[in-house]
Amino acid sequence: MVCAAYYNGKENSIAVSSGRGYTRDNRIKPDFAAPGINVTGINLRGQFVARSGSSIAVGITSGALALFMEWLDRHGVNLDASQMKNLLILGASRKTDMNYPNQEWGYGALNLYRTFEQIRRF
């Protein structure tokens, strides 16, 4: 299971209402953080609107995972869910002045481009 916190991309800070880790049995959660504050998208009327919340971050995370799975499929790479999550964690962006993993950002901010850069190194 992938668990994402959500953050404000303009301020580069975790949202006050975003969940924090760790779990009761000390597993590291969240795995990473995804954008979730004032994210622009299109509504049912075709208008651009800004939305915020954990559901926005979940949509971005799901979309990133779908793109990642499509790429893996096209390249004949078979990974299980745990391996995919670990590669996303490996590609997460990290601030230099912060220790990771931590209770707010997990292993960092979701960065699909950086995940692909890490895969190229293998």
Regions found by a protein language model. Give the residues of each.
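Hydrolase catalytic cores
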Residues: G36-Y100
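Zinc-dependent metallohydrolase catalytic domains
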Residues: Q103
